[in-house]
């Protein structure tokens, strides 16, 4: 039956169809088991063992026939896979791409998260990632739960055109030329915060595949503003949201890049760790890569913002990299001319001299 449906509509995701069909059959089986149990109880025929057995069978319905990978029987496939190079989508920041072994996984099945304190620039990083991916001729869906579509579009336009945001209004022709000549496309969709679930995002993204548009990346600003009907506390809700969002990358075979907040302990901290992620350590356990964004007062004055690797399933972690940020065009670039130790030492010396003078 599932195969028949997939032959009718080539855009149907077979795994998702099996999952939904399986869920439907389970719900129907449980419903009919409840009705039968009620009838038996009314007739005075109560056998709790039989009732429990029927409920367990109903809940254990499975349409999965694939037994997985047999290490012995599939050794040739395993050996062949050792030399397979997975396609990546570069972030265009050399430090990050090296850490990710080439960039974001093009086939998806991965969730990348930027973590930072309030107003540190998480949306600026997400906007830069969206622009950098689109410049490679890719289609990017950007879900915004905090800013309006037009405000986000302004940020994207100033980044792509390199026309300062304050000057775009008087440079309409140059702006139009820069945007129309750029490769790829970015689709920005705004939803009110805390009103949509991961399923809402999945249903919306499906509209693109229904129209024959392959999404190469999905950017979500940001995870904590997605609603979860499941969970009695913030830990359970954020954990569920993160798991469901990561699952979307399997459905559309593209990476998902998002952001999250740091808690108070992570504010003004150099190179914050996973313990400073706000609300739920479940997010840290689920995401494949988590990058910290941090900046001190001296950095801000010098137009520097730092990126740290908090968690990385695809490479090393624990290192940091200074980035240059141009606030006039909201452009972030790797700062290779800055030596971390030497720069930090200089900044600390200047800060000490400043305190002495005061």
Locations of regions flagged by a protein language model:
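Noncatalytic partner-interaction/assembly domains of nucleic-acid and motor enzyme complexes
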Residues: 1-24, 357-358
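C-terminal regions of RecA-like/P-loop NTPase motor modules
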Residues: 199-218, 232, 244, 250-252, ...
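Structural recognition of the conserved hydrophobic beta-strand(s) that form the central parallel beta-sheet
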Residues: 255-260
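Conserved ATPase-coupling elements of RecA-like P-loop NTPase cores
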Residues: 227-234
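Cytosolic-facing regulatory segments adjacent to core modules
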Residues: 97, 102, 132-214, 228, ...
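The Walker A/P-loop phosphate-binding site
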Residues: 63-163, 176, 186-188, 351-357
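Walker B catalytic acidic pair
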Residues: 222
């Amino acid at each position: 039956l599932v195969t028949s449906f997939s032959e009718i509509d080539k855009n149907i995701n077979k795994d998702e169809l099996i999952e939904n069909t399986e869920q439907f059959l389970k719900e129907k089986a449980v419903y009919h088991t409840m009705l039968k149990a009620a009838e038996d109880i009314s007739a005075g025929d109560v056998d709790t063992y039989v009732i429990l057995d029927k409920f367990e069978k109903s809940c254990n319905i499975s349409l999965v026939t694939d037994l997985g990978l047999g290490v012995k029987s599939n050794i040739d496939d395993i050996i062949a896979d050792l030399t397979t190079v997975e396609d990546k989508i570069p972030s265009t920041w050399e430090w990050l791409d090296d850490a990710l072994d080439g960039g974001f996984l093009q086939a998806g099945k991965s969730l990348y998260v930027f973590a930072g304190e309030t107003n540190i620039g998480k949306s600026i990083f997400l906007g830069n990632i969206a622009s950098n991916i689109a410049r490679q001729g890719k289609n990017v869906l950007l879900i915004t739960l905090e800013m309006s579509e037009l405000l986000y579009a302004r940020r994207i336009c100033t980044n792509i055109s390199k026309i300062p945001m304050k000057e775009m209004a008087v440079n309409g022709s140059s702006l139009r030329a820069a945007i129309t000549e750029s490769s790829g496309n970015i689709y920005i969709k705004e939803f009110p915060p805390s009103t949509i679930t991961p399923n809402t995002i999945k249903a919306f993204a499906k509209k693109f595949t229904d129209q024959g548009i392959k999404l190469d990346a999905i950017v979500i600003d940001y995870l904590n503003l997605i609603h979860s009907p499941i969970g009695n506390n913030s830990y359970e809700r954020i954990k569920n949201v993160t798991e469901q969002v990561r699952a979307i990358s399997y459905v559309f075979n593209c990476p998902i890049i998002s952001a999250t907040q740091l808690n108070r302990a992570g504010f003004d901290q150099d190179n914050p760790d996973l313990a400073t992620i706000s609300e739920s350590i479940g997010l840290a356990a689920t995401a494949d890569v988590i990058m910290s964004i941090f900046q001190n007062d001296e950095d801000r004055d010098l137009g520097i913002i730092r990126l740290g690797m908090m968690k990385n399933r695809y490479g090393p972690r624990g290192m940091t990299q200074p980035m240059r940020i141009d606030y006039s065009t909201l452009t972030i670039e790797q700062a290779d001319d800055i030596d971390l130790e030497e720069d930090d030492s200089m900044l600390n010396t200047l800060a000490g001299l400043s305190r002495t003078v005061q």
